[in-house]
């Protein structure tokens, strides 16, 4: 029986937006003798149990490939963070020069009315409208193998994990949605407690006619 057990790792963090420096995801390690999420893994699961997220399912995932994929994405993000730091340093230098008093600036700059107007506005405390540096976190396909930006573009993913530099797309890999089979049964009544009481006349139909290994095995059992 132990030979049939497969490793499954869950994360109890329901959303990547709850990540912070103080709140870290907790991972639960379990084993399963079933066919994983390909067949009724959510059968009779309570709402609390269904809130867990799958990090690794040995029924469908390859551990070595998963680690390589995560390492590759982390390396890509690290390279982009280095580029961002370099660009940020240049931006800060330019900003400090722009916000310096008018009297300390080169007199040649006064020839440009636009530059002069900009300096006066800064000295008066006005904030110029700037383009949003951050892309929408929903604009990324977190399950895509392709990176969201090219080498020539800067990565503006919002840091969701308390300054560690891990972007939303990278964090979401470790918090992907639960995979459910289309054949899974879902009950609404008393889902929070797991106490499923059928109402009078309630009927739940499970499709068993299609040619699948599970249905064929079921037919063999009831013969």
Swiss-Prot record:
Residues 78-117 are annotated as: Disordered. Residues 96-105 have a biased composition (Basic and acidic residues). It comes from the Eukaryota. Residues 78-95 have a biased composition (Basic residues). Induction: In carbon, ammonium, phosphate and sulfate starvation conditions. This is Protein UGX2. It comes from Saccharomyces cerevisiae (strain ATCC 204508 / S288c). The gene is UGX2.
């Amino acid at each position: 029986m132990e030979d049939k057990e497969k490793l499954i790792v869950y994360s109890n963090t329901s959303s990547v937006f709850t990540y912070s420096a103080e709140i870290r995801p907790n991972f639960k390690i379990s084993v399963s003798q079933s066919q994983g999420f390909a067949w009724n893994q959510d059968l009779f699961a309570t709402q609390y149990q269904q809130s867990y997220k799958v990090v690794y399912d040995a029924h469908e995932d390859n551990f070595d490939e998963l680690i390589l994929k995560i390492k590759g994405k982390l390396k890509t993000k690290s390279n982009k963070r280095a580029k961002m730091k370099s660009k940020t340093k240049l931006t800060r230098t330019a900003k400090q020069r722009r916000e310096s008093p008018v009297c300390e600036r080169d007199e040649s700059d006064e020839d440009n009315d636009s530059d002069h107007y900009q300096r006066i506005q800064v000295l008066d405390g006005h904030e110029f409208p700037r383009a949003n540096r951050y892309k929408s976190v929903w604009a990324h396909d977190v399950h895509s193998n392709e990176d969201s930006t090219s080498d020539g573009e800067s990565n503006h993913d919002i840091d969701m994990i308390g300054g560690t530099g891990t972007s939303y797309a990278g964090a979401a890999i470790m918090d992907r949605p639960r995979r459910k089979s289309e054949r899974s049964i879902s009950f609404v009544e008393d889902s929070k407690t797991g106490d499923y009481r059928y109402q009078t006349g309630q009927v739940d139909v499970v499709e068993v006619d299609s040619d699948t290994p599970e249905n064929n095995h079921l037919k063999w059992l009831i013969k």
